[in-house]
Amino acid sequence: MTNADPHELQKFSDLAHRWWDPNAEFKPLHELNPVRLKWIDSHAHLTGKRVLDIGCGGGILSESMATLGADVKGIDLSNEALGVADLHSLESGVTVNYEEIAAETLAAREPASFDVATCMEMLEHVPDPSKVVEACKTLVKPGGWVFFSTLNRNVKSYLFAVIGAEYVARMLPKGTHDYARFIRPSELAGFARAAGLLTADIKGITYNPLTRDFGLSSDTDVNYMLACRREA
């Protein structure tokens, strides 16, 4: 299997049936989604664009981008998650084309086919994130947008994203994240640059546990998002 960790895949496959429950394990994704969607749309203007959502899981971001008028394809390597995504798409009436395929495989099959690629909360779960970044560049057209989100690697992110979120607040199941796979912004920007992507914007994500609100910030110490463009 290309650039995939079977343990990571199984972890999310086991939770697939809970993906669209806004009060279950994926509650943080439901709460975060409006913030990341607005930020992506502010750069890429999604209406009418062909969009690829890499590591789409149950389709939370995929469906919301389609609702804005994008032609969305979602890919993942968890058959269980894709089954949930397909079923929810039928129930909601929001059209998304889902496929079980690796980004690298799709890049070889359909290079320069998308206006936008999103790869959110996924890079920290694969053995070689640089290969996914390279595939993202190949998949978008010249001038196309690529969006990433992941977790910084430092003491603060370990305390907040692992100890705080998984063990204290129990926002996430224990073992959701492997700290060793967290990626510093400089490392991700380096992967992007090596692939031929130009960094256009970086934003940190903040969380208020009292209001349960996510927001954008210049603080990239924990969660952050990176917007890139393929050179025209």
Curated annotation (Swiss-Prot):
A single MF term (Gene Ontology): polyprenyldihydroxybenzoate methyltransferase activity
Binding site for S-adenosyl-L-methionine: 36, 55, 76, 120
InterPro entries in alphabetical order: SAM-dependent_MTases_sf, UbiG_MeTrfase
Pathway the protein contributes to: Cofactor biosynthesis; ubiquinone biosynthesis
EC number: 2.1.1.222, 2.1.1.64
An annotated GO BP: methylation
Recorded catalytic activity of this chain's protein: a 3-demethylubiquinol + S-adenosyl-L-methionine = a ubiquinol + S-adenosyl-L-homocysteine + H(+); a 3-(all-trans-polyprenyl)benzene-1,2-diol + S-adenosyl-L-methionine = a 2-methoxy-6-(all-trans-polyprenyl)phenol + S-adenosyl-L-homocysteine + H(+)
Keywords: Methyltransferase, S-adenosyl-L-methionine, Transferase, Ubiquinone biosynthesis
Listed Pfam families: Methyltransf_23 (PF13489)
Family of the protein in this entry: Belongs to the methyltransferase superfamily. UbiG/COQ3 family.
Annotated function: O-methyltransferase that catalyzes the 2 O-methylation steps in the ubiquinone biosynthetic pathway.
Protein name: Ubiquinone biosynthesis O-methyltransferase
Native organism taxonomy: Bacteria, Pseudomonadati, Pseudomonadota, Betaproteobacteria, Burkholderiales
Name of the gene: ubiG
